[in-house]
Amino acid sequence: MTKRMSVFTALIILSLLFSACAAGAPAAPAGGGESAAAPAGGESAAAPAAGEKMVTIGYTSSLTGKLNVESIRQTNGLNLWMNQVNDAGGIQLADGTAVKFQSKFYDDESSGDRVQELYTKLATEDNADFLISPYSSGLTASASVIAEQYQKPMITTGAASDSNYTQGYTLVYQAYTPASKYLTGAADMIAAGSPDLKKIAIVHENDKFSTDVATALQSYAEGKGYEIVLFEGYDSGTTDFAPIINKVQQAAPEALLGGGHFQDGSTFARQLAERGLPLQYLVLLVAPPEPSFAELGDAAVGVAGPSQWEPQAAYTAEAADAAGLSWYGPSATDFVAAYEAAYNEEPSYHAAGGYAAGLILQAAIEQAGSVDAQAVKDALDSLDQLNFFGHIKFDTTPEAHGLQTGHEMVYVQWQKDDSGNLVKQIVWPAEAKTADALTPVR
């Protein structure tokens, strides 16, 4: 396995030297724009040569709407994986077939109604062989119904809600750590760093994902003896958090946990800083791990958040050996270098998740030795390996089929280095941290 994957990685690295300058190199989609790797509504590759099999991957991306920041980066990661595999000659099957990929994708406009319409089109008109989910749990719930209805295996990324995997689906597989575990580590971090702290406020966006996270956190924190002094939701699209902040001030928590997505989380953090509320810990979903969160300046200092992946996370071939797992794919260093070369920006965990979704599908196809949907499903059911994104393993029980059981979160916090520059540090778990948590926040 190690030797085979070394060859795989070498091919990928060599291909990047050419693809970074090629006309087909991926470009970050902008609002309303198209990715060079996957033009909206069109194929991303020419007709297959002799001995090649062209496989169609279908998905939607929120090029417009409130989810565009996270979704575009997820799409960038997926397109990078696809271009690398194709440039390296495809996935080689035992019978000599080289499997290459083309994509069909559409702008879902961050709309669940559009997702159902477009995934139906992907399954019935575009004849996609495999599906990748849109970004967000709400949109993925809409896509999952279609994937199951038309028996199309779908890798979900950017979709952490547990509830999507308790619907009896058998072809939907989650790359992310489930929402129920998104913020529970924050309670553990606080307990370890500030054992006398007891009062926590939970403020969350009223969407499927954020509500699942908040509800699971409330139960977990209460079980650890914390007093939840405020449990409050806010509407998606909220831009004025003054009424919420007033309630937080009245409740006088020592720590504030919650949030939702990038736009609301960034705005909430900025307005909290402007009000100067005294907090020992401020832990928000989704927004803090994004590199662009640093644009908040001093308002970003001390803000922490769970991340599905960070470049510093120690997922390596050596770690796989130590854990008794097989290692698959490129290293985090190789992924980061490739992404930065292609998009001229640091990859966020959303970008890593998009790439990981492709890598999971690739591993399943290789293990199955086929692109037959049932064979790939069987391979996904038995997958248990470590890649640059983390441990990948799926629940195969009828009650939660496809739920991710291997992957774990890391927690980042924005701090200032000795030169006064904002930097992200891993502050939890203890075995992965690069710095102690900065507390109090204000």
Residue ranges and their predicted role:
Residues 76, 128-231, 280-314:
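Extracytoplasmic ligand/sensor domains, especially the bilobed periplasmic-binding protein
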Residues 58-81, 106-112, 135-136, 203-212, ...:
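Extracytoplasmic "Venus flytrap"
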Residues 137-148, 253-275, 357:
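Hydrophobic alpha-helical
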Residues 1-56, 149, 441-442:
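Short, low-complexity disordered leader/linker segments with a strong preference
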Residues 273-355, 424-441:
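Extracellular/periplasmic periplasmic-binding protein-like sensory domains
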Residues 69-76, 91-166, 175, 234-241, ...:
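Beta-alpha junction/loop-to-helix N-cap segments that form part of ligand/metal-binding clefts
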Residues 338-351, 362-424:
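Segments of small-molecule ligand-sensing domains
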Residues 70-94, 215-223:
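Short, polar/charged alpha-helical segment
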